[in-house]
Amino acid sequence: MNHFPKLLSSQIGFDVAQTMLEGFDRHYRIFRDAAIHAKTLFEQADWHGLQKLARDRITSYDERVEECVELLEDEYDAENIDDEVWQQIKLHYIGLLTTHRQPECAETFFNSVCCKILHRSYFSNDFIFVRPAISTEYIENDEPAAKPTYRAYYPGKDGLAATLERIVTNFQLEPPFEDLTRDVGCVMQAIQDAFGVFDEAPNFQIHVLSSLFYRNKSAYIIGRIINGDLLMPFAVPLRHVKPGVLALDTVLLKRDQLLIIFSFSHSYFLVDMEVPSAYVEFLGTIMQGKPKAEIYTSVGLQKQGKNLFYRDLLHHLSHSSDQFIIAPGIKGLVMLVFTLPSFPYVFKLIKDSFPPPKETTRAQIKEKYQLVKRHDRLGRMADTLEYSSVALPVSRLDEALVRELEKEVPSLIEYDGDSLVIRHMYIERRMVPLNLFLQNGNDEDIEHGIKEYGNAIKELMQANIFPGDMLYKNFGVTRHGRVVFYDYDEIEYLTDCNVRAVPAPRNEEDEMSGEPWYSVGPHDIFPETYGTFLLGDPRVRRSFMQHHADFFDPALWQRHKDHLLKGELADFFPYDGSVRFCMRYPERFADAAGAASNEQDAPDAGRSVRAA
């Protein structure tokens, strides 16, 4: 600080700091309560309840920030507090965090509140936490000894099978398991298939995070196996095989598999963490190289992830010299997109005006992005970070980009000395646009890209998402080869769409016409027409018809819509179906299959399953 207070003499400074910390503590209680409630909903197989819980939790943070801002304005006239007192407020707040279990998240909450009250000129480390002040290393859990951040198990004493069974039962889930002994045997077989027979080192042990990770219809056990110098990650998804009966679905043993389930294209996990930094540290050991910002985001602390990401961006800018440029690919009608080649993200701004045929507004587009944020993304829609008042050095902006910004988004930019301040933007992970992937790829790439594209849209359909504009340029290919949707301005709920077949032409003139000879309502969709803009390349057509010939059949789209209108939720697996135990080791499931067959033969079986 330029004028570091020698004496913290302001009572108002302490009171404001205390009020802000109480606001954060209320937020984090609600955050943890949601994760605790997720366990009950999972046990009850209340999937709609879990979806609502996840949606409500996303909006909870901003609601707590607004509550705190209003309280500070009403009680302390916060906008008129002078600079010296604001500096003392931060120092008092630091003092209050010295024994806190979530100091890094509390610092971010402080920033969120201050940014609502203070002018942008105050966004420096004198007044807010541009850099962290409290270390998060070695924070101990305050829970009872029965629930540390992670538990350590030593299989040498009781054997691996008994240890694995104890790991599962320690989570004390209420529904019984269909056959836990069988499932544990599958885990052991999968470990042997992956690593062969290995000698147990003296330090052979298994570490398991004490809370389950809930998302969709699964609860994940997350841990690591340590043997000598080796550290092996694992994740075990638990699922209901039928109402009220659980099973271990598979075991994921590869880093890449874990990176996918913690990907930016999936919804956030519901997980109870008293010391979130300890969870993030643990997860970092099993997904080495994954930024902490992304890990915080994946466990539901998206504001902390957003804060860390911005710090990473500032750090990168100070240690790089390349320029921001217009993103390669076809320019969008609605968004201006630019990137920094040395930084794996894109920056997206909503244009001031849109040419025909686009009929939308900036407010409507923002609402579409919020819809995606709240919705279950299923690994098929990119998450976005939303920022306001981002200052970028003018010297790092390519001249062509500056001209494009001044032409397309003059209302969003403002020059401030050596910086260009952007009033609003979205930031996403950079991917290879699918149109470029197909254009530059060989036959194998095209087959993979088209198969993934069709799978992505079919999964989005099942999640009640109609992408709207399905051109290949609106999809990207991740570094793991998955196709992900990232253009949201025309997105709709499938249940709001009217699926129609193209009426037969009335005469030869209709048949030769380049315009529709039938009426088209604002929510009408015609799957039969999609081939016109998707199948121009013969290689693409061949792959499309091989893997997704039903894509252009209105019956497929209507069937998914009908299931959604009945309240049915499809099963989704963020891993290849071939690794599921029931597919990988079918011989171990023969008894279960026989029992299921007998149940179906019983007169009341079908009715009870449907009712459930």
UniProtKB/Swiss-Prot annotation:
Pfam family, one: AceK_kinase
InterPro entries: AceK_kinase, AceK_regulatory, Isocitrate_DH_AceK
Entry protein name: Isocitrate dehydrogenase kinase/phosphatase
Disulfide bonds: none
The keyword Cell division belongs to this UniProt entry's keyword annotation: no
Entry keyword set: ATP-binding, Cytoplasm, Glyoxylate bypass, Hydrolase, Kinase, Nucleotide-binding, Protein phosphatase, Serine/threonine-protein kinase, Transferase, Tricarboxylic acid cycle
GO annotation terms (biological process): glucose metabolic process; glyoxylate cycle; tricarboxylic acid cycle
Active-site residues from the entry: 383
EC number: 2.7.11.5, 3.1.3.-
Record: residues binding ATP: 327-333, 348
Catalytic activity: L-seryl-[isocitrate dehydrogenase] + ATP = O-phospho-L-seryl-[isocitrate dehydrogenase] + ADP + H(+)
Family stated for the protein in its record: Belongs to the AceK family.
Main location as per UniProt: cytoplasm
Region described as Disordered: 593-612
GO cellular component, one term: cytoplasm
GO molecular function: [isocitrate dehydrogenase (NADP+)] kinase activity; AMP binding; ATP binding; phosphoprotein phosphatase activity; protein serine/threonine kinase activity
Compartment list: Cytoplasm
Function: Bifunctional enzyme which can phosphorylate or dephosphorylate isocitrate dehydrogenase (IDH) on a specific serine residue. This is a regulatory mechanism which enables bacteria to bypass the Krebs cycle via the glyoxylate shunt in response to the source of carbon. When bacteria are grown on glucose, IDH is fully active and unphosphorylated, but when grown on acetate or ethanol, the activity of IDH declines drastically concomitant with its phosphorylation.
